[in-house]
């Protein structure tokens, strides 16, 4: 997680991984004016890092606090993207 939110980037997909590493180390195979398509999607941070006291209907928990930076909603389900 970055300070501004989650950054998801997709570029060229290589398989197997060591073949991708070797191709990257060897340098570009295309002319310098050709670039691989890149998509960057930035998700804003959904929850602010604050601490809020729980309501009084929780018995014997006067000192319990809820940290709103913990999310119970998974990001892929919320955004509609599937992470593979």
UniProtKB/Swiss-Prot annotation:
Induction of expression: Translated cap independently from an internal ribosome entry site (IRES). Highly expressed.
Highest taxon listed in the record's lineage: Viruses
Protein name: ICP35
Species of the source: White spot syndrome virus (isolate Shrimp/China/Tongan/1996) (WSSV)
